[in-house]
Curated annotation (Swiss-Prot):
<keyword id="KW-0479">Metal-binding</keyword>
<dbReference type="Pfam" id="PF00437">
    <property type="entry name" value="T2SSE"/>
</dbReference>
<comment type="subunit">
    <text>Forms homooligomers; most probably hexamers. Interacts with ExeL/GspL.</text>
</comment>
<keyword id="KW-0472">Membrane</keyword>
<feature type="binding site">
    <location>
        <position position="431"/>
    </location>
    <ligand>
        <name>Zn(2+)</name>
    </ligand>
</feature>
<keyword id="KW-0862">Zinc</keyword>
<dbReference type="GO" id="GO:0005886">
    <property type="term" value="C:plasma membrane"/>
</dbReference>
<dbReference type="GO" id="GO:0008564">
    <property type="term" value="F:protein-exporting ATPase activity"/>
</dbReference>
<dbReference type="InterPro" id="IPR013369">
    <property type="entry name" value="T2SS_GspE"/>
</dbReference>
<dbReference type="GO" id="GO:0015627">
    <property type="term" value="C:type II protein secretion system complex"/>
</dbReference>
<dbReference type="InterPro" id="IPR027417">
    <property type="entry name" value="P-loop_NTPase"/>
</dbReference>
<keyword id="KW-0653">Protein transport</keyword>
<dbReference type="InterPro" id="IPR001482">
    <property type="entry name" value="T2SS/T4SS_dom"/>
</dbReference>
<feature type="binding site">
    <location>
        <position position="398"/>
    </location>
    <ligand>
        <name>Zn(2+)</name>
    </ligand>
</feature>
<comment type="similarity">
    <text>Belongs to the GSP E family.</text>
</comment>
<keyword id="KW-1003">Cell membrane</keyword>
<keyword id="KW-1278">Translocase</keyword>
Length: 501
């Protein structure tokens, strides 16, 4: 690693920020180290580049050469380090908008940090998307009311108000987003769905867009799928070692059905992707039918549902079974037809994985029966049901211990030491003063043993099956409470996501 000094001049009051496009194309990052200007560069930077940076900076700087991979990581970290710039772009928008900017297409492949377009509405959208990615938001809500326009981000599963731009921006903002997502810009009376694929700071991001008419204009929700921020290993999902070992064994079975249940946004798809990634190999043919394809898995054949051309889950699943699969993943079992094909596939030598929108693991069994699946078929095919939720994890920099109240001891339903403490959120700069940073899963894994199989075959009720499994299967709330006692999350979080249980 080399370091050398250019000619010395005085340091300006504020070191200029090099444009991202220049920094990436020419391989330089201008920063400071202990008050001294420092130019970090990748190998082979041209002398002309150093002279140009010297001219722009107006001062001397040290030059330090990094390896190519190290430089790329530092480049992205440097230009994503300060989210206040993105927020300032949004707050500084004037009241006068350039209406002609709406007609200008933003190329799908353009990197938003490269954008040099001064149209305020485009700057607003660019800044909003960049800010959401930096905050690791899963959704952006743009809500129009009588007097205000509200932008909210869903961060760690909880909506947080970010900004209230000028109310007059509403129609311009919605129209531009509809243009980007290939929607009918003139149709405002019916809901529409669209999709945007773009890059932000070198990161591939898919955006699912949904609009809906409301009293004072259209509401827009953007679901962000940051392909660089997905955890595709079972050990990263927060499972206990025992559950992880059981899941690892189950997904290597030659045939049967494994179901993952939980409400929307509980991480079901991520769990399935992690399971497929673990067993993905050259000697297995793994095929999926999804709506939508959230993440690309190398070596896995993935098919997108398209109801406009009658490409449904059921039709896709039928076609997949003619493609000689070993493992089949169905994004969701929504109807009897899909359920019947999935069961038949599992009985004819295929391992099938899918999701159901039920609140409990046992609820998945009764849901399949209610759909019309015969109990004897279900008992023969079902291997296991995994119920899961996501809870926010406490910020390790500011969490603080507190005693447990008597009411909380009753809610936890387990014997605890008299001086047992739990942790509470406090809030600091590291967690944006929320007390939480990131999320983890809590799980309940029901393995279908002979006793449960017999209960399903005899059409026993949900409560009867619940009694059978509870002796040897910890509930999802118990798994959450174990994480509370370890200081990973708060009791309030676990109670929030498991109240219906």
């Amino acid at each position: 690693m080399a370091a050398y000094q250019l000619d010395d001049t005085s340091l300006p009051a504020a070191l200029p920020e090099l444009p991202f496009a220049f920094a990436r194309n020419f391989g330089v990052v201008l920063t400071e180290r202990q008050g001294t200007p420092l130019l970090l560069c990748r190998p082979g930077v041209a002398p002309q580049t150093l002279l140009e940076v010297r001219r722009v900076a107006g001062c001397a700087f040290e030059v330090e050469q990094l390896g190519s991979d190290e430089f790329e990581e530092l480049l992205m970290a440097h230009y994503q380090r300060d989210s206040s710039e993105a927020r300032q772009l949004m707050e500084d928008l004037g009241n006068e908008m350039d209406f002609f900017a709406l007609a200008e297409e933003l190329p799908q492949s353009e990197d938003l940090l490269d954008a040099d377009d001064d149209a305020p509405i485009i700057r607003l959208i660019n800044a909003m998307l960049s800010e959401a990615i930096k905050e690791e938001a899963s959704d952006i809500h743009i809500e129009t009311f009588e007097r205000v326009l509200v932008i909210r981000f869903r961060i760690d599963g909880v909506l947080r108000e970010i900004l209230r731009p000028h109310r007059k921006l509403a129609s311009l903002l919605v129209s531009r987003i509809k243009v980007m997502s290939r929607m009918d810009i003139a149709e405002k009376r019916v809901p529409q769905d669209g999709r945007i694929s773009l890059r932000i700071g070198g990161r591939a991001v898919d955006v699912r867009v949904s609009t809906m008419p409301s009293s004072y204009g259209e509401r827009v929700v953007l679901r962000l799928l940051d392909k660089n921020n997905v955890r595709l290993e079972l050990k990263q999902l927060g499972m206990t070692l025992a559950n992880r070992n059981i899941i690892s064994e189950l997904i290597r079975k030659p045939h049967g059905i494994i179901l993952v249940t939980g409400p929307t946004g509980s991480g079901k798809s991520t769990t399935l992707y992690a399971a497929l990634s673990e067993i993905n190999s050259r000697d297995r043919n793994i095929l999926t039918v999804e709506d939508p394809i959230e993440y690309d898995l190398e070596g896995v054949g993935q098919t997108q549902v398209n109801t406009k051309v009658d490409m449904t889950f059921a039709r896709g699943l039928r076609a997949i079974l003619r493609q000689d699969p070993d493992v089949v993943m169905v994004g969701e079992i929504r109807d009897l037809e899909t359920a019947q094909i999935a069961v038949q596939a599992s009985l004819t030598g295929h391992l099938v994985m899918s999701t159901l929108h039920t609140n409990t693991a046992i609820g998945a069994i009764t849901r399949m029966r209610d759909m019309g699946i015969e109990p004897f078929l279900l008992s023969s095919s079902l291997l296991a049901v995994l119920a899961q939720r996501l809870v926010r994890t406490l910020c390790p920099d500011c969490r603080a211990p507190r005693p447990i109240t008597e009411q909380e001891r009753l809610a936890m339903g387990m014997e605890l030491a008299p001086d047992q403490q739990v942790w509470r959120p406090v809030g600091c700069e590291q967690c944006n003063h929320t007390g939480y940073r990131g999320r983890t899963g809590i799980h309940e894994l029901v393995v279908i043993d002979e006793a449960v199989r017999e209960a399903i075959h005899s059409a026993s009720g949900e409560l009867a099956i619940e009694r059978l499994i509870r002796d040897h299967t910890p509930s999802i709330r118990r798994d959450g409470i174990d994480k509370v006692l370890k200081g990973q999350t708060s009791l309030e979080e676990v109670l929030r996501v498991t109240r219906e249980d």
